[in-house]
Curated annotation (Swiss-Prot):
This is Intraflagellar transport protein 27 homolog. It comes from Trypanosoma brucei brucei (strain 927/4 GUTat10.1). GTP binds at residues 12-19, 63-67, 120-123. Keywords: Cell projection, Cilium, Flagellum, GTP-binding, Nucleotide-binding, Protein transport, Transport. Belongs to the small GTPase superfamily. Rab family. GO terms for cellular component: ciliary basal body; cilium; cytoplasm; endosome; Golgi apparatus; intraciliary transport particle; motile cilium. One of its GO terms (biological process) is intraciliary transport involved in cilium assembly.
Length: 183
């Protein structure tokens, strides 16, 4: 049995749904926050993600404020981050345009981290200002995986986290095999 620990940062412009996403993960999809409270600096949760009968990944998930006034502190939250999630609101093009800045900021502070791009608020598709193609193109250009979710509806919120956990366990097992063969 393997228990691995992993640091994940969720970043993006204000009001894209980062806090709601993290809170939904924490409650296993049962509690959508009814009131919006701006994240001050950074909040975090610890989430255990079972991968199979033998492996679990404990994720320390940081919900990083998107407010500019907290930007000087953001780099300290991003250090040692193995995975980063950049989130935008499909109904707000400005939040999508901010994604490139977030990707650059994370990669400056944590060069080896794996990136995921999440298009949130898919329940607002009738008001979409960003197409799926635009999201996928941005993800591909930055070597990131792309997911489309609705935190409000609880649709797709576990897929990115489950994928991260599976990828992390697979990478760990491959590394163990490599080290074993070196003997």
């Amino acid at each position: 049995m393997v228990n691995l620990r992993l640091q994940v940062a969720v970043v993006g412009a204000p009001t894209v749904g980062k806090t709601a996403f993290v809170q939904m993960l924490h409650s296993n999809g049962t509690t959508f926050p009814k009131n919006y409270l701006m994240t001050l600096g950074c909040d975090f949760i610890v989430k255990e993600v079972p991968v199979d009968d033998d492996n679990t990944v404990e994720m320390i998930i940081f919900d990083v404020s998107g407010q500019r006034e907290y930007e000087p502190m953001v780099s300290s939250y991003l250090q040692n981050t193995a995975v980063f999630i950049v989130m935008y609101d499909v109904s707000n093009k400005v939040t999508f345009e901010a994604c490139a800045r977030w990707v650059n900021q994370v990669r400056t502070n944590s060069k080896e981290s794996v990136g995921i791009l999440i298009a949130n608020k898919s329940d607002l598709s009738d008001k979409a200002e960003v197409t799926d193609r635009q999201g996928k193109d941005l993800a591909n250009a930055n070597k990131m995986k792309f997911y489309k979710i609705s935190t409000l509806r609880g649709v797709g919120i576990t897929e990115p986290i489950d994928e991260i956990a599976r990828h992390y366990v697979d990478a760990y097992q491959k590394r163990i095999e490599q080290l074993t063969q070196m003997r």
